[in-house]
């Protein structure tokens, strides 16, 4: 007797429920990723960070893990078969975006290692626990919730009051970075949490729709601006990570010693 295999409904429901849980985690992750390292900065002294590698590790773990996971999720979504374009130009853009998302994921993981190994001197505890997270997390957040990276539909998708909230989120990283006083950086890092919290509450109780025309010129321009800011932020993080790893492991000196015999043979 032949029987047909019918998918069990509860498996589909479980998958949907898991997706909802992941979405909730990613929604609150930017707030936790800013608040936790900031709390660590207030609780512990500069000497504590200098003396404890574990303390440095748990301080940088949350913000850079959020970054790595978020870009990995975006990359996974972009690589789904139904999102792959057919045209040459769209394919070039598609693979370029995927390469950038992969690079941002790798840089985030590399930064966890490098910034943990770094010797936190002077104001480095402020830099790694507050300034850097409050600089790159807003861009990562906007790229994940306010933009669409699918070829043919690429653009900024927010509408209504969310656009104003996004502007505030974009402004805080810049002000936090250019502020010279430590107390000002702390203030902007704390203020950054407010627009995110307002947006989360608004989407829960009064959700707003997404634009049906994300490819409008100004929407594509906004996405391009966010991508440029993300690119510069992660380029800075990559360069700083490479300098730290080179100082710690002496990578350049090892390369010079390896290349020296080959030069002498010529």
From Swiss-Prot:
Pfam family name, one: DUF2463
InterPro entries the record matches: UPF0328 (IPR019081)
Domain of life from the UniProt record: Eukaryota
Family in the record: Belongs to the UPF0328 family.
Protein name: UPF0328 protein ECU05_1690/ECU11_0040
